[in-house]
Amino acid sequence: GYATPKELMDDMDQALSLIPGKHKINLHASYAIFEDGEFADRDALEPRHFRKWVEYAKERNMGIDFNPTFFSHEKAAEFTLSSPDEEIRQFWIRHGQACIRISQYFAEELGQSCVMNIWIPDGYKDIPADRLGPRARFKDSLDQILSIPYDRSKVYVCLESKVFGISLESYTVGSSEFCLNYAAKNGIISLMDNGHYHPTEVVSDKISSLLLFNEKIALHVTRPVRWDSDHVVLFDDEIKEIAKEIVRNDALDRVFLATDYFDASINRISAWVVGIRNLQKALLFALLQPNETLKNLQDRSNYSELMVMQEELKFYPFADVWKEFCRQSSVPGGSEWFEQVRAYEKAVLWKRK
């Protein structure tokens, strides 16, 4: 953890100095910054509690995306937006509404849209007696959150599903079917996290279906190891397939991309830099593919030639293009960036209490 918000901001600056391209900050509501002696509970958060984040973003010409935090709170011990306890459910509804207002504040202050993603950890460890009731309450809670006036051209509300989690082995309220149907019916955005599905399912296969029926979709890019473990994103086959699906379907302006991972066993800055650079590498790799040629081979049933081409392309010199992109962005192209992290660790991180 961090002793102060400034420590977090300093580390973000260090990471951003090593990652090429343009980025947005993705904040959780739990990162509110209070003045000395001040506190507001989750249902009473206001834009002013995020003013310092807006100042930080403005100085760096960045936007901010946002997430209500429906966990790590005494009122999230069991259920949140699907709670049978009406007092607790209304508390979390007010939190969601507060976050929409904060998201619009971000969009208006920073001059770019804010993507606000809703995910709740509600579910049952063992076989439930009522599957419909919690989902009906969740549906009503979302209806109430979305009932407040907000500018849908500035705030893009997303809904994220999950197959199961620790202590939710038997039933997750916000399942894929629930979230896809709710988003489609209510004109909000479906968000897919590639760690939130059964291990035999891949998000790369789901993107094309969603693009056919939605103007915009959203992704949390992570790396699941046997379950939703949120390992650091690697330049692996599935990340490349996800990037290819976005690029070859001409959907770069229709897919909101965020990374969602953390590994507390390694240096935080290294984790940020490795994971984000790998997602960028995957997008570059996809942009360099002869996508029309490959599609024509598939349509003409030339499967042998298609396989040969796909395999040969893995050895094409895409790393040269990556290094040029890094050079133009004034960041290290290869692993030499790690020396800067090591120096920062010695000069700054080790001196923190």
Q: Model features per residue range: what roles?
A:
Residues S113-G123, I127:
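Aromatic- and glycine-enriched pocket-lining scaffold segments that form the walls
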Residues S83-D85, S208-S209:
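Short, hinge-like loop/turn segments at secondary-structure boundaries
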Residues S30, W119-G123, E160-K162, D260-F262:
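Short loop/turn motifs enriched for small/polar and acidic residues
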Residues E87-A98, D140:
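A non-catalytic, amphipathic alpha-helix used as a structural packing/dimerization or gating element
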Residues G1-P84, F91, I100-I102, E108, ...:
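Alpha/beta catalytic barrel-like cores
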Residues F106, K125-E238:
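Acidic/histidine-rich catalytic cores of soluble enzymes
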